[in-house]
Amino acid sequence: MSNLRITKRRFLKSLTGVALTACGGSLKHFSFDTYSKMDANLGLELTFYGVGCFGIRCRGSQILTDPFFTYLPLMKVAFGTVLPDPKQVDPYITELQDVAAMLVGHAHYDHNLDLPYIAEKLHKNSYVLGSKTLKHTFAPNNLPTPFVVMNDRVATQETLGEWWVHPNKKFRVLPILSAHPNQYLFFHLYKKNISEDRTTVPKKVHHYQEGMTFAFLIDFLNTEGQPDVRVYVQSSSTGLPMGAFPKSILDEKSIDIACVAMDCANKKMNGEVSVIDEYPATHTFFCHYEDFFRTKEQVPKEIVKVDLPKAKEFFLDTSKQAFYFPKADARFIL
């Protein structure tokens, strides 16, 4: 009887959680930012694949954040299997084969579902950077790519943290302690840390527990090993001090590009100080605004916590920074 109660509770929790994130308005007439070639002269190509997934190519290396291409219907996520769909991922594989690192902000399925499938297609010098929970989650997948646990390397507002440098010496990554907000009101789902390897491949939404949440600072390096282009990524945020790092790091190099969740935009729109203010970037791209229970072929919808038209109007009023609301699969040359 106890197992039945647990199953029922999990059933209701899954249904409630996924339903709440799928209740936003239509974006049929929203003016997204699409392909753009800018005059920044950074030598960087940025592709927004959707949710928190960006391809960032610079100085001969590509980094992929939060690898998620498989959009599954709400009912399947709530009650069925949650596994990569090759039909949705394969169209992108060719442009991902030079990925040197996959960075995962936290271990919910919408930030890493396609990681095992993509990892099989990558070269031997590609790495996965993420939490202990993520590593334990995918242990039974026997990933062919080396896994770098970032928990003990995190920077905070007061601590410098520890950079990870790719063996090719072309880029380095600093994990920054962040946090995941409630999905809606007081609902916060699948927030456990996992301390032991799973024995079976994850295939249900509750198998993807949150674990530690990160933001990342990415430096593409010049031939002397100094930061040439700097990118900040935060795909989940509860607001400062989460996502903050010592400002002395900015003495070395300011931030050229920021890829941040709509939570950051909402904080600023509500009059709160956000990472957008404290760690300004020349170019800021907003992400994780869409209902990902709909395929890319369908008319996009925003999630319940987001008002994209209002946000775009708000951020157009600023002249100090450039802000973008990219459409899925939009590519930007900077």
Each PLM stretch: what is its role?
Residues S2-L4, R10-S31:
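N-terminal export signals
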Residues T65-D66, V99-A107, L129-S131, Y232-S237, ...:
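Active-site neighborhood of phospho(di)ester-bond hydrolases with catalytic His/Asp-centered motifs
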Residues Y127, K135, A139-N168, E272-L334:
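Binuclear metal-ion centers of metallo-dependent hydrolases, dominated by the metallo-beta-lactamase
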Residues P146-T223, P227-V229, K320-L334:
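Flexible, acidic/histidine-containing loops and adjacent segments that form or flank the divalent-metal
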Residues V201-E278:
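Active-site-proximal loop/helix segments of hydrolase catalytic cores
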